[in-house]
């Protein structure tokens, strides 16, 4: 087709619609040439026609034509100037799309067009960037995002910060640091660097305040900023506006700063920099969306309605019918429909909804019409008016609108994604009104289903935002039915692909947590580490828009604001690489360091405690492994902190091997000292200053070895080399398992600091129970110096403990022992040096790191954290377990070795909470044993499995082992099978009782026995075959009847094979028995696995142990079945036991020397409820003076709640139980025989010393037998009431920890016994100076126990009047007042009763200020839904009335309703008559306290 070049614009406009591509290309070139020539006139018929003709070129698929169209627009902008502004709204969106073109030339022309718009004043730079930002920051095309960042940089360079405010763009730019595209991330970094050049150091704090900036990115940006500053690239605007940030610059710096011309710069080439971390962007809209409606516009429109002429109720019906017809007619004029929707609001304003048929009939009719509008209406004004009407209906009708909302909700949600902003925003606000006012549980299903299934990110993001409002506005009761669905939905949305949805979901999580803390913990435990950190940041930052507030139920441990960095990469760094051993004389360097440290230490050392005089190798408060130590700062007297520039020689001797050389001790422990953060030694520094590593696996001679052996270390007593706490102590498996119910968490939220204080120790005093008894209340007891009480030669330099090789086999689990340092004869207090990190969240971050050195530091710190007696919260524990699942197959040997230490420590602390994790633990350890390992690693895994044996219930272990063996989906290796069978054999032989064997004949048992029989006939591996046969025999020995039944169900072939194995073993055993000592057996195979008697054999009553009353040992000791000889010894002593019972009971009953009498009140409650029980019991408690040594004989005990050699048998149990069950018997006079020793100690019945009572009490936990707990607590109460309280004061914190644990028990009698002891403590003036520091914790714990049971409630009711005289007024009011205000029944009732009794006993001290504090809450309680709370509040107000007088209280009564005031007047009059009649004013108060 012939082409003729046009001569004017009208000619170009006429030819533009032509379809010939060649013509278009030529026409486009000619048009650009025409427009670029200033001599050519641009006058035409209509410039709009030219713009309309260029638009298809711009949006077409031909890149050359699109490029020419951009050039043509640029030329038009130059010619028209500001007149082009009329066309920017049409052109700009398509220019944005061309920014993402695949051709570089097209993108460049688009950039030039944007520059021309700013340069020729078509749009101011700020206005143009704002318009672009609304869509470019979140544009789906990565090229658009990248080019827009370049546009910001160009504009900034061209116009500077005077015309362009960049602060508003920083958050969305930071969000792009986590963009999936590498080029966008690089462009974002470059953009921030360019912004820094203009604004200077003001940018740094803004970036640090943004939690969504990954720490690695922040560190990179800081480095680039520093580089820019050092190179003098900062512009004058940055230096002028620093406002003091640049004060550090000297003249030379200023000279180096040069002005740079503000000109357009070429875009730098992108280099592929990978980013491994994806942030959670917190992108806020830069500007408001044009056309969007707001909540204010809704509110102002609610009552903008037409006036209705209503004269009769029928008129309203007529109007309603007209409205219904109009809004249902799709063909009606849209203005009429808008007016009809307004009339609906007008009818509601006139209370039309009060008519009975409105909700039942007319709302249903309206819902159908509204569904049609929301589904099919195209007019935005109609939909907007419908949304306003829906919002007003929800605000007016509230829950009556539930059926209506259920009908329209799904369609209303679908409008969120509408491209028209007015529709999307109106529907969103209508949804907010529905959530705020219509609390209908049936609506939640639609919310959650849509959120889970919607593919629109706008819908998901908005619904996540609405979830925050949902959890803030709705009551817990309305959410309970759908709690699990909400949990699953919230969990999914936290991991949503859209950043805004994730952000709102994190806010919603903390709001959800206030309703369901347990379910929130479940969500937290399933998240990965990054998501958990993001959650914590939202909580710390307070969230956005008031939605991210934290709650009292969240984890206590918070990261500090000033902490450096956020991830392991930016936290504490390890020291530089060590010098070679050949570089310096390492021995001299180390000895010099030791001398310097000791010199510093000797200036600060404290005298030894009274109980540590024998422990010469320990100093100060560190004499016992579990005692509190002064936390010395490394900069204030302790070991000086190592500077980054310092280096420390690193000896290259094999770990754990003493390599003495002629004339040298360079590898003795004194040369193993390390820097503060010098690697693995940080963990063990608290013990020895040396580095006790695992064995290297290199064969070594033991002929001249100084390695510890069981016959030398610990006084010749057997102990576990790795996890034992020393020859004189035994870490027991029973421990305080803190229960954290939501109610308790809410009640005790204010007292966590007090509970934390309890974990510090007894004011630095040595605790004589430390190292001998188990930890209680979260404080670890059970670390003492190895063998200090047994042997004095352990301090000698030649002793086994001092040798380096002994570390591998004798270091304690907590590593709190101090060893002699060879060559110097000095000892340092290594407790001043800590693990790399103390903050648990930092530790968890490091453990989750991908770098092995950071994981190592994290594991070291976590091990030390647990070893210090601290416990993890439920959230932290779940997070740690999730990380550990990945660490089980860690390929780095050093990290895995530390990991096993940490796992062991975790088991020791949290065994009771790891039952569900046991299957994973065993499976992973067995799989690891199936790989090729060093001998040292192999033995270490088995040591961990030994701890599993001892700290998990044997029945649970059997169940999980059967599950592992019978799992047909797994095909373990031969080595793995051998490890499993060996573990099972050891368990059955050593730890199980016959009752532990599953008795339900489950399929798992049958498959397990079948599998064992198959493996016992395996022909490939002799070792596997032998181990399988041993396992069969062990199980048969464990429970012969059950195994016989299981074997009978096997196929004939395997049945014969298994029986042959068992019979052959029986024959061997019978032969060995015939050749040895003949002893009767209790089962055919009782001698096949000899199990030594594990119960202690010390103390005067050790042999008087009935098989029914083995409270301290037999119920949990690691014996499966004792031989008949042992059983006969026990049975033969039954007569002696009964004789002793009767004799001791008679002595207690008839002995009157040194007695004190306690009369029980008629109701049986005066704080000594159990005396009449325990007075008839033989408290056979005997801890011999050398019990430390004797208890060490049982270091291999397992599953025992007590390791102390203690006997507390409850005699005449039936009588005790009967008495305990009837505490309201008639008044009885109880006599308890006590005497006083020369040293001031009490001597109770059966010569039980007060020190023994306290010692035993400190070992109590809530899971021990009820009779034992009652006996021990009763004895402790006697000592507190009748003694001088010297010992209870000395160990007050340990006693408090024990009592707090006891009060968590499930058994009511145990809780009551604990409350009695607590009552005596609070009534003891001698202990007042101690318990006053923990008053808040004590009162809140009492209030918490009030909801335990009816018996506990009655006991507390009788306890409150007795402790009230001792309570301080101000502090007590401050504690109970918040509980009265916010507590739930019955905790608020208990708080009111405490306030009533305090008012009764401290009436003269009450002031107007006190009345102002408590009266508003009492007034609200007077209208409580619970009648008992109302009654107690009324009695309390009456008491205040008489204490403070009518003139002060009566004005306050105005807040009460008239009926309540009349009721108060009745009670006041009755009280006044009672007082005038000579009655006591306490009667009514007592009635209130018992109501």
UniProtKB/Swiss-Prot annotation:
Its main localization is cytoplasm
Q: Name one GO molecular function term.
A: GTP binding
Q: Where is the composition biased (Gly residues)?
A: 542-551
Q: Where in the cell is it found?
A: Cytoplasm, Cytoskeleton; Nucleus; Cytoplasm, Cytoskeleton, Microtubule organizing center, Centrosome; Cytoplasm, Cytoskeleton, Spindle
Q: Could you mention a single GO BP entry for this protein?
A: axon guidance
| Keywords in alphabetical order | Cell cycle, Cell division, Cell projection, Cytoplasm, Cytoskeleton, Developmental protein, Differentiation, Microtubule, Mitosis, Nucleus, Oogenesis, Phosphoprotein, Repeat
Listed under GO cellular component are:
basal cortex; centrosome; chromosome, centromeric region; cleavage furrow; contractile ring; cytoplasm; cytoplasmic microtubule; fusome
Whereabouts are the HEAT repeats? 44-82, 85-123, 163-201, 402-440, 874-912, 955-993, 1289-1327, 1408-1446
Annotated stretches, region: Disordered: 537-586, 600-739, 1065-1127, 1167-1205
Q: Which Pfam families match?
A: CEP104-like_TOG, CLASP_N, XMAP215_CLASP_TOG
Q: Which InterPro entries match?
A: ARM-like (IPR011989), ARM-type_fold (IPR016024), CLASP_N_dom (IPR024395), HEAT_type_2 (IPR021133), TOG (IPR034085), XMAP215_CLASP_TOG (IPR048491)
Q: Which family does it belong to?
A: Belongs to the CLASP family.
Q: What this chain does, per the record?
A: Microtubule plus-end tracking protein that promotes the stabilization of dynamic microtubules. Required for several aspects of mitotic spindle formation including the formation of the overlapping central spindle microtubules and kinetochore attachment. Required for the incorporation of tubulin subunits at the plus ends of kinetochore microtubules during poleward microtubule flux. Acts antagonistically to Klp10A and Klp67A to maintain metaphase spindle length. Also required for guidance of CNS axons downstream of Abl.
What is this protein identified as? CLIP-associating protein
């Amino acid at each position: 087709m012939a082409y003729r070049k046009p001569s004017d614009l009208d000619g170009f406009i006429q030819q533009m619609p032509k379809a010939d591509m060649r013509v278009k290309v030529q026409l486009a070139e000619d048009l650009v040439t025409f427009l670029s020539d200033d001599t050519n006139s641009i006058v035409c018929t209509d410039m709009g026609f030219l713009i309309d003709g260029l638009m298809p070129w711009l949006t077409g698929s031909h890149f050359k034509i699109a490029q020419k169209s951009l050039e043509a627009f640029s030329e038009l902008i130059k010619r028209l100037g500001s007149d082009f502004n009329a066309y920017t709204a049409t052109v700009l969106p398509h220019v944005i799309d061309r920014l993402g073109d695949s051709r570089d030339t097209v993108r460049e022309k688009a950039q030039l067009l944007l520059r021309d718009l700013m340069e020729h004043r078509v749009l101011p730079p700020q206005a143009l960037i704002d318009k672009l930002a609304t869509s470019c920051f979140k544009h789906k095309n990565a090229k658009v995002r990248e080019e827009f960042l370049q546009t910001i940089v160009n504009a900034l360079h061209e116009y500077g910060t005077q015309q362009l405010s960049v602060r508003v763009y920083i958050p969305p730019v930071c969000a792009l640091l986590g963009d999936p595209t590498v080029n966008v991330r690089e462009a974002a970094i470059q953009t921030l660097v360019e912004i820094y050049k203009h604004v200077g150091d003001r940018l740094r704090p803004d970036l640090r305040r943004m939690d969504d900036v990954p720490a690695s990115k922040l560190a990179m940006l800081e480095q680039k900023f520093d580089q820019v500053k050092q190179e003098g690239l900062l512009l004058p605007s940055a230096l002028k506006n620093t406002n003091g940030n640049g004060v550090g610059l000297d003249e030379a710096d200023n000279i180096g700063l040069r002005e740079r011309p503000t000109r357009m710069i070429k875009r730098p080439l992108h280099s592929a920099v990978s980013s491994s971390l994806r942030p959670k962007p917190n992108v806020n809209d830069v500007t408001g969306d044009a056309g969007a409606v707001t909540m204010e516009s809704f509110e102002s429109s609610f009552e903008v309605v037409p006036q209705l002429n209503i004269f009769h109720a029928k008129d309203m019906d007529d109007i309603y019918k007209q409205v219904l017809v109009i809004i249902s007619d799709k063909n009606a004029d849209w203005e009429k429909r808008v007016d009809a929707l307004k009339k609906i609001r007008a009818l509601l304003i006139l209370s039309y909804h009060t008519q009975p048929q409105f909700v039942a009939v007319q709302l249903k009719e309206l819902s159908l019409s509204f569904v049609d509008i929301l589904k099919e209406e195209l007019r935005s004004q109609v939909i907007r008016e419908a949304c306003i009407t829906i919002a007003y209906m929800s605000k007016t009708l509230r829950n009556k609108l539930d059926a209506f909302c259920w009908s329209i909700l799904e369609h209303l949600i679908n409008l969120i994604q509408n491209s028209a902003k007015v529709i999307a925003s109106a529907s969103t606000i209508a949804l907010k009104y529905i959530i705020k006012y219509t609390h209908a549980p049936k609506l939640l299903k639609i919310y959650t289903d849509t959120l889970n299934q919607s593919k629109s990110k706008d819908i998901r993001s908005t619904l996540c935002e609405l979830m925050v409002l949902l959890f803030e506005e709705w009551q817990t009761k309305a959410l309970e039915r759908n709690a699990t669905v909400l949990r699953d939905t919230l969990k999914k949305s936290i991991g949503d692909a859209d950043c805004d949805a994730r952000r709102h979901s994190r806010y919603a999580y903390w709001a959800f947590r206030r309703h369901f803390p347990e379910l929130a913990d479940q969500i937290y435990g399933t998240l990965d580490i990054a998501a958990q950190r993001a959650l914590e940041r939202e909580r710390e930052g307070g969230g956005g828009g008031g939605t991210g507030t934290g709650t009292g139920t969240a984890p206590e441990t918070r990261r500090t604001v000033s902490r450096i960095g956020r991830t392991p990469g930016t936290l504490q760094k390890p020291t530089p690489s060590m010098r070679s051993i050949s570089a310096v004389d390492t021995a001299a360097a180390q000895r010099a360091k030791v001398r310097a440290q000791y010199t510093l230490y000797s200036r600060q050392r404290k005298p030894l405690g009274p109980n540590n005089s024998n422990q010469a190798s320990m100093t100060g408060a560190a004499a016992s492994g579990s005692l509190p130590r002064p936390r010395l700062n490394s900069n204030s007297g302790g070991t000086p902190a190592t500077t980054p520039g310092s280096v420390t020689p690193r000896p290259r001797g094999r770990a754990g091997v003493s390599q003495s050389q002629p004339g040298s001790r360079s590898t003795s422990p004194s040369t193993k000292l390390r820097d503060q953060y010098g690697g693995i030694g940080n963990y063990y520094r608290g013990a020895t200053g040396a580095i006790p590593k695992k064995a290297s696996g290199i064969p070594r001679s033991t002929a001249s070895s100084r390695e510890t052996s069981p016959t030398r270390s610990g006084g010749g007593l057997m102990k576990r080399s790795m996890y034992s706490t020393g020859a004189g102590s035994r870490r027991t498996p029973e421990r305080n398992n803190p229960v954290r119910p939501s109610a308790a968490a809410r009640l005790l939220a204010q007292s966590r600091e007090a509970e934390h204080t309890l974990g510090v120790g007894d004011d630095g005093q040595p605790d004589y129970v430390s190292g001998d008894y188990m930890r209680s209340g979260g404080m670890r007891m059970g670390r003492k110096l190895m063998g200090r009480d047994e042997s004095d030669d352990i301090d000698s330099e030649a002793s086994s403990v001092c040798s380096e090789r002994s570390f591998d086999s004798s270091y304690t689990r907590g590593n709190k022992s101090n060893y002699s340092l060879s060559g110097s004869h000095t000892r340092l207090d290594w407790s001043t040096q800590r693990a790399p990190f103390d903050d648990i969240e930092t530790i968890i971050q490091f453990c989750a790191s991908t770098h092995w050195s950071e994981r190592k530091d994290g594991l070291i710190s976590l091990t030390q954290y647990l070893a210090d007696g601290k416990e993890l919260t439920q959230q932290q524990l779940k997070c740690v377990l999730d990380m550990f699942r990945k660490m089980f197959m860690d390929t780095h040997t050093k990290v895995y070795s530390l990991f096993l230490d940490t796992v062991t420590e975790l088991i020791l602390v949290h065994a009771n909470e790891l039952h569900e994790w046991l299957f994973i633990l065993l499976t992973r350890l067995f799989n690891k044993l199936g790989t090729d390992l060093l001998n040292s690693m192999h033995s270490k895994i088995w040591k961990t499995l030994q701890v599993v044996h001892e700290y998990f219930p044997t029945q649970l272990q059997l169940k999980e082992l059967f599950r592992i063996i019978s799992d047909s989906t797994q095909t373990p290796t031969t080595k793995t099978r051998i490890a499993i069978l060996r573990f099972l054999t050891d368990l059955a032989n050593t730890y199980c009782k016959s009752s532990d064997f599953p008795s339900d004949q489950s399929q798992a048992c049958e498959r397990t026995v079948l599998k064992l029989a198959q493996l016992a006939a395996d022909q490939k591996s002799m070792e596997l075959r032998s181990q399988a046969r041993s396992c069969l025999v062990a199980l048969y020995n464990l429970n012969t009847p059950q195994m016989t039944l299981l074997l009978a169900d096997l196929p004939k072939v395997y049945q014969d094979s298994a029986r042959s194995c068992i019979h052959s073993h029986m024959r061997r055993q019978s032969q060995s028995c015939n050749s040895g000592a003949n002893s009767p057996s209790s089962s055919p195979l009782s001698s096949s696995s000899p199990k030594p008697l594990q119960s202690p054999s010390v103390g005067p009553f050790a042999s008087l142990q009935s098989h029914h009353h083995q409270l301290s040992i037999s119920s949990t000791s690691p014996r499966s079945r004792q031989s008949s000889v042992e059983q006969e010894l026990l049975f033969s002593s039954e007569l002696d036991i009964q004789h002793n019972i009767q004799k001791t009971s008679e002595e207690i009953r008839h002995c009157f020397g040194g007695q004190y009498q306690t009369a029980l009140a008629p109701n049986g409650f005066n704080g000594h409820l159990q005396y009449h029980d325990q007075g008839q019991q033989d408290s056979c408690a005997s801890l011999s003076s050398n019990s430390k040594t004797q208890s060490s004989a049982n270091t291999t005990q397992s599953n025992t709640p007590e390791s102390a050699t203690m006997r507390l048998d409850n005699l005449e149990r039936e009588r005790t139980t009967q008495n305990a069950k009837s505490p309201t018997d008639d008044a009885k006079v109880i006599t308890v025989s006590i005497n006083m020793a020369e040293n001031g100690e009490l001597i109770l019945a059966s010569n039980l010393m007060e020190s023994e009572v306290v010692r035993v009490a400190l070992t109590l936990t809530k899971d021990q037998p009820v009779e034992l707990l009652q006996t021990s607590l009763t004895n402790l109460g006697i000592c507190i009431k009748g003694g001088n309280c010297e010992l209870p004061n000395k160990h007050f914190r340990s006693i408090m920890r024990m009592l707090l644990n006891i009060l968590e028990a499930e058994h009511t009698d145990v809780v009551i016994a604990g409350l009695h002891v607590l009552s005596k403590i609070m009534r003891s003036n001698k202990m007042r100076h101690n318990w006053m520091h923990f008053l808040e914790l004590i009162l809140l714990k009492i209030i918490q126990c009030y909801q335990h049971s009816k018996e506990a409630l009655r006991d507390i009711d009788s306890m409150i009047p007795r402790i009230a005289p001792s309570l301080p007024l101000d502090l007590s009011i401050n504690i109970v007042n918040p509980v009265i205000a916010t507590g739930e029944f019955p905790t608020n009732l208990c708080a009111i009763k405490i306030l009533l009794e305090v008012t009764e006993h401290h009436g003269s001290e009450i002031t107007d200020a006190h009345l102002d504090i408590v009266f508003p809450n009492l007034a609200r309680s007077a209208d409580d839904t619970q009648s008992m709370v109302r009654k107690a509040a009324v009695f309390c107000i009456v008491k205040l009335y008489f204490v403070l007088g009518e003139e002060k209280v009566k004005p306050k009564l105005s807040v009460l309703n008239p009926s309540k005031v009349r009721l108060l007047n009745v009670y006041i009059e009755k009280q006044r008559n009672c007082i005038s009649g000579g009655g006591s004013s306490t009667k009514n108060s007592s009635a209130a306290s018992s109501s």
